[in-house]
Regions:
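Short S/T/G/P-rich N-terminal loop/turn motif that feeds into the first structured element of a domain
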Residues: 1-69, 108-160
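Short, hydrophobic/aromatic alpha-helical segments in well-folded domains
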Residues: 32-36, 71, 81, 94-97
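An amphipathic, aromatic/His-enriched active-site/gating alpha helix that lines ligand/cofactor pockets
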Residues: 79-107
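Helix-adjacent hinge/juxtasegments
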Residues: 60-87
Length: 160
């Protein structure tokens, strides 16, 4: 899928925590959120990330108030910039430990879509894109890594 001129790449990733965020078994994940988010913010190609009052998104409850549902939403200049962050930084190690902290999702949990440069998506907008991907599969409206032929790093890690 070609990137439209004047657009950036938005992504939403959701997951259900195995335990409450305050549970000691979640400490390695929760205690490193600021570190990993800070790393993302310093990466070439990073544009923006959603934050709630916690400074991350750990307190956002978009799914019927479920305290164990977590979201991550960000905007990047392009798919390559996002892929380099996800697969070529310490983030990859945390992704590799995801089963320690997150339940296995039965359905899609990751979506990407193009946004006009300068647009900051809302959580509701992102959830609507994820729902669209679930219902209709990849399209110009909502897609996954397979729709970005230039971004190949995900193939070795089997993301989304």
């Amino acid at each position: 899928m070609d990137q439209p001129a004047g657009h950036h790449l938005a992504q939403l990733n959701i997951g259900r925590l195995r335990y409450e965020a305050s549970d000691p078994r979640m400490a390695d994940f929760v205690d490193n959120l600021a570190f990993v988010n800070g790393l993302a913010e310093r990466r070439e190609g990073f544009v923006w990330r959603y934050q709630d009052d916690s400074g991350s998104a750990i307190d956002t409850r978009p799914f019927d108030g479920d305290p164990r549902m977590a979201i991550n939403m960000s905007v990047w200049t392009d798919g390559d910039a996002l892929a380099r962050f996800v697969w070529q930084t310490v983030h990859k190690r945390f992704y590799g430990q995801r089963h320690d902290w997150f339940e296995t999702m039965a359905d899609r949990y990751f979506v990407m879509w193009w946004v006009s440069a300068g647009h900051r998506p809302t959580v509701q907008e992102a959830i609507e894109r994820l729902d669209h991907l679930k219902r209709h599969g990849p399209s110009d409206h909502a897609f996954d890594w397979e729709s970005l032929p230039a971004a190949q790093l995900w193939k070795t890690a089997r993301c989304a």
